[in-house]
């Protein structure tokens, strides 16, 4: 497949969470790189979190592995172990069915950009 034209890659802004759970994730912005490249086995997203925005509600996946790499800015990773600051160059992995809920929160004053990679196993959101 040739180089992706980022202007043609699908973008998803906001969330599918119902109120009031949608509020902290409302301004997240996902450039769906995997979809733009026709990938079917795993998803790849370029996620931008503005200050105060969450990546998601805290969650874990039964069937899907998930990986995040911080490209720029700073976020706070929240898991069962507590809170951990992450900056550009840091990464985290979330194996399927580990039961440790996670999410990322941008508590800084600048945008944060992350690369998300995850299995597409269906029926596991």
Regions found by a protein language model. Give the residues of each.
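Conserved short histidine dyad/triad with adjacent acidic residue
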Residues: 27-30, 45-61, 99
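Short beta-strand His + acidic residue motifs that chelate non-heme Fe in jelly-roll/DSBH
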Residues: 57, 77-78, 94, 101-107
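Short, charged/polar surface micro-motifs in flexible loops or helix N-caps
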Residues: 50-54, 74, 83, 98, ...
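Short, conserved beta-strand element in jelly-roll/cupin
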Residues: 46-50, 61-79, 117-121
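A short, N-terminal "cap"/entry segment at the start of jelly-roll beta-barrel domains
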Residues: 1-41
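Short, conserved, surface-exposed binding loops centered on an aromatic residue
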Residues: 35-38, 48, 59-61, 67-68, ...
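Double-stranded beta-helix
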Residues: 105-125
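Short acidic-glycine-tyrosine-enriched beta hairpin
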Residues: 80-97
